[in-house]
Amino acid sequence: CLFEYENKVESKEVVHVLGLDYSQKHLYVDSEGQVCDYPHFYRASEKRLAREQRKLSKMVKGSNNYKKQRNKVAKLHAHVAQQRKDFLHKESRKIANSWDMVVVEDIDMKAMSQGLQLGKNLMDNGFGILRNYLKYKLEDGGKRFIKVDKWYASTQICNHCGAKRKIGLNERIYQCPKCGHIEDRDINAAKNIRDEGIRLHRG
């Protein structure tokens, strides 16, 4: 006799909500004002990777030495990737355990890398992977993961009064022309992302 079991995850009440803003200098900045710094695994291994890659390029393709060196380069890349995954799994688990709902922007990380020429920085950041890990960890626990539209002007809105102003890429502080509120631009953006997620959740 065969039995089918359906795993139903009970939805948790949404009380504690966190907004995450992508940061070029860090992994992310959150709506609580916390900054998550990211170990730069790729940059830490970049010189060694380049050195081993140069050795490989000088070898005769198909030779035993070439195959050995190719495997060595592949293992180095795999090691860096595994370091990144381990860190992001731990970080996403910590967030998923602490919050009922997490809100992020639905930004295209690959397009951003090409458009702003962030190549290596973005390769080392892992924010896109973190979002994926958060999504399934939260949803497996009956919690919410929400993406706000990529065109949502999170950096332009004053989280204090709702006024809107354009802000340059080099401006690190948001100063509202209407109410005078002053705040770190990334924290202000993370709070706006959080609030927009709450609005979307409530419908």
Model-predicted regions and their roles:
Residues 1-203:
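Positively charged, helix-rich recognition surfaces that bind polyanionic ligands
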